[in-house]
Amino acid sequence: MEMRQGGGFATLTPEILLGPLNDVEQKYAPARLFVAGPMEIPLPSPRVSLVGSRKASRRGLEAAREIARFLVRKDAIIVSGLAEGIDTAAHTSALNNAGRTVAVIATPLDRSYPAGNAGLQDKIMREHLVISQFEIGDSVLKQNFIFRNRTMALISNATIIVEAKDDSGSLHQGWEALRLGRPLFIWRDVLDDPSVKVPQDMLKYGAIRLDELEEILPSLPQNESLLEIVQ
């Protein structure tokens, strides 16, 4: 874990960041969020989370890059957790394709985990937005990552599970997205893996199998870039 000298951090409520929350959204919403970066507040839409395995396969990484590239070309903001694997692929693909990205992290803003992503975190802080619900000085606990995924589901208009096993932390976000009534997409490769059972159960509760990228668009808040292909 890498420490950094912080500055320019702001403290916001979720309502300031996102707009009014309903009772379901308020249940697990953090009381306050710490943010760093120049992105406009309230956050513009659409915002789509890409989540998945830290120890991602080459195929999973390629899928994350492809999905992120497609979405930023439709003016969507890529949200992810700055972890190794799928998260890193999603953030970097957004940046490499002149898109926007938001990192929701499980550490205070003055720390980086993994340490190898410190440079990426700094770049997103300078040019986009990094969000944490953990105050500077807070301990970094295992449960932080579950709380982070709940918050990321709240921030996002939709979540896509790109790659996962049954013990993957990204599944916490999937269940929270369903609880919130937000679209949850599960990439086809996850559902075609016979060793993975939990995502199959998610389909029974409203998750959507994602075979073609265009299938995401009708579920997102509409802007001109999206309307060009939806109509």
Question: Which residue ranges define each predicted feature?
Answer:
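Glycine-biased, small-residue-rich flexible motifs in mid-sequence functional cores and linkers
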Residues: 4-231
